Structure formats: structure tokens, C-alpha cells
Amino acid sequence: MEQAPNDNGPQREPYTEWLLDILEEIKQEAVKHFPRPILQGVGNWVFTIYGDSWEGVQELIKILQRALFTHYRHGCIHSRIGS
């Protein structure tokens, strides 16, 4: 009978820690490209919908990723994307 191989790789950090690390990186990048009031509004909207939950963190990451990609693709003079 087939068996899954043993996991001998390095230990991964917990998913929640990884989410918080990713959110922090994306927030730092977003602050460089978007006005703070807009980012605060998005954060407040996500908090209103999802509360203080991991689903809210995931949704905020998705929104900021899409906003940054669109910004890079269509208008950021510092980006090589779309050049």
C-alpha cells in the first residue's frame, strides 16, 4: 500500500504568523503608494465586515495585493511591471 513520504523538511511557521508577516509587508508597500486616509478607510471597512478575524486579515491582504498590482500595472512610475 502506498504511503505519503515523511516530512523531513524544515518546520514551517504557523499560518497565522505567516499571514501577519505578509500583511505587514503589504501594508508597508501600500503606504508608499496610496494616501493613508484611503488605506484607513479600507481597513475600517474590512473590520466592519469581518471584525477582528483571520478572514478579515486574508481579505485585507487580497484587497491590498490587487490594488498594488493595478497601481503598478497602470500608473506607478517606479515599477517595471507593464513597461
Swiss-Prot record:
The keyword Transcription applies. It comes from the Viruses. The modification Phosphoserine is found at S79. It is found in: Virion; Host nucleus. One of its GO terms (cellular component) is virion component. One of its GO terms (biological process) is viral penetration into host nucleus. InterPro entries: RetroV_VpR/X (IPR000012). Its main location: virion. Keywords: Activator, AIDS, Cell cycle, Host nucleus, Host-virus interaction, Phosphoprotein, Transcription, Transcription regulation, Viral penetration into host nucleus, Virion, Virus entry into host cell. Stimulates gene expression driven by the HIV-2 LTR. Prevents infected cells from undergoing mitosis and proliferating, by inducing arrest or delay in the G2 phase of the cell cycle. Cell cycle arrest creates a favorable environment for maximizing viral expression and production. Interacts with human UNG. This is Protein Vpr. It comes from Simian immunodeficiency virus (isolate TAN1) (SIV-cpz). The lineage of its organism: Viruses, Riboviria, Pararnavirae, Artverviricota, Revtraviricetes.
